[in-house]
């Protein structure tokens, strides 16, 4: 029998010496570590972030993040606030125990130098550079006194467990779509973030000075770096109990101890009002409904057992058994109420962790910021407590990754969680060719809009005398002039715009019975209408003109309309056959074409035109002799008098329409500011024509703005619905009580919103853009050149 040789691998190893064991242990400690992070990257607790936005936290845990914008909540109608609250409850009830939700609210300072540069208007080397510099200074001053360059962003991170990345992706996508649906029902703009966006947010938290984020996915492989290397701070230090170091700055994480019997829906908003760098996080973990009910029932049973023990003790001691410790009675009632809510109402139970992260340049500033945040908590009978020796875990839990390492939790029902409403006021801050429209009075953020991007850029400016209506128009004119190449036209019934137009080297056309400036109301160009023949729209204008001339409450009769239309076709026949200036008709041609019909109705219209053809008001019976070549043109119609003013406004509107049709082919927008706009809406035919032009402006690249102080006259027009439906931009300044009531009903303004147009200061009010209603303030400093050329106050105008 052969002997089996034992392989060398299985031979009993030699016993290690004590010195060898010590050496090996040292090597293992060096390379294995003690579990504590040794680098800033190691503190960031995720394994990978993928380009589609999925974050792998560990082998079985994955998260995605939604960025959502603010909506107007605090100033909304009560029924709107209730609806938003109910939709929030629905969102939380959608989340089951397998989904962890983290709401993050970040107030982040951007690079002040770069931020200020974004509002600079570059010099052009012309006569307006001093105005550009002054206007830029005004914007930057408003920026400094407003939000101090703080950008406020909101995120919802949802975390799940899954066996692998493929399964996680499918479920996260489905959950993301469902959550977006809930945001949509609240009227909130939201989107699921991709990986680059998530990394940029992390970088912003770790670099609070606003250092720009530089990263591309194709940089990873050649560099051998991970995504953490691009977002991590230069250093993290957790050497003290209640603060930590963050790349040369100081930070502290606190938790909210909820002590109040009732919570306010303004509490979260007040935390976010602070102008310091702050990051507020709410970790919300749903408890399985069946398990929650069982737990509460067990608690009630325990409380009942304690009650029985207390009653037995009372009987033995010889006093009333109904006298129980107050805490025991209170806890028992609260537990039964909670059970009733879970069983009979649409309520669920959640565990909430509320964290506040403050970051500052110095320890003293950090202490002040934390004290300020603690004051907000105290206001609502809660307490903000610094985390002791858990600052690293607090920082990790404050990152929008969906990780909560702080187990200081408070059980709350659905409605209690939803009371932390994440909305205050919607912002209007568009990029690109946006212009400045003031400061959001609620959030102190700048309002930057591009009206040309709106569905209907047409606008209205309404306010009492002295409310800043003209200043608002002039401020917008300056913005358009300095930041675009668009044409600007002004209908100026009170000669208020002359100083501004003169300083901007614009053209003033003065129309009056004694003026030598003439504008032919019958001017037409071949692009006048979308139709093959431009006569249809021009005929509407002539009908409106004749209606104003003839007067009367009933307007033109059917036969009168017919004879006018027939005359219009006749007088334009030569011009359409040979479109040269010599063939352009004037009013006397229309007058003669009416007489040539030999009809009593035609004669009646011709007689009404006599005053404007051969009488003392024949200022409009001439060919146009002004070259409207300037990009800024003001029509001064102050001296036309009451009889001619409406005609003048109608003719100006028609002239500007002609310019709009010409500019359309060149891709240039045409802005039109019409003061005393209500005058065009009194007569039926004129109102109908103006409403039609109002609608056409939008399609042809026009941006009209009607301004008036006579709100009742404006709103009494039969065409006001068409005007309002085609106006996505409305500025409401101070209003008289009657007008305020009418506007509030027509525009569905809440009581809180109405306060901003009641005895408001000049330049303050409400701005309505599409579906957003914002309180705003847009004062122009009096010690500026701009103010002096824009003011309408007599004492200040004289100083010019």
At which residue positions do the language-model features occur?
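Post-Walker A helix-loop "phosphate-sensing" segment adjacent to the P-loop in P-loop NTPases
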Residues: 479-489
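Conserved lysine of the Walker
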Residues: 469
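P-loop NTPase motor domains
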Residues: 71, 78-97, 104, 108, ...
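Hydrophobic positions on the alpha1 helix immediately C-terminal to the Walker A/P-loop
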Residues: 472
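A short helix-turn-beta junction within AAA+ P-loop NTPase domains corresponding to the substrate/partner-engaging
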Residues: 505-509, 719-732
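Extended, folded cores of ATP/NTP-driven motor/assembly subunits in large transport
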Residues: 2-423
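Hydrophobic anchor at the beta1->P-loop junction of P-loop NTPases
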Residues: 461
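Conserved P-loop NTPase
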Residues: 747-800
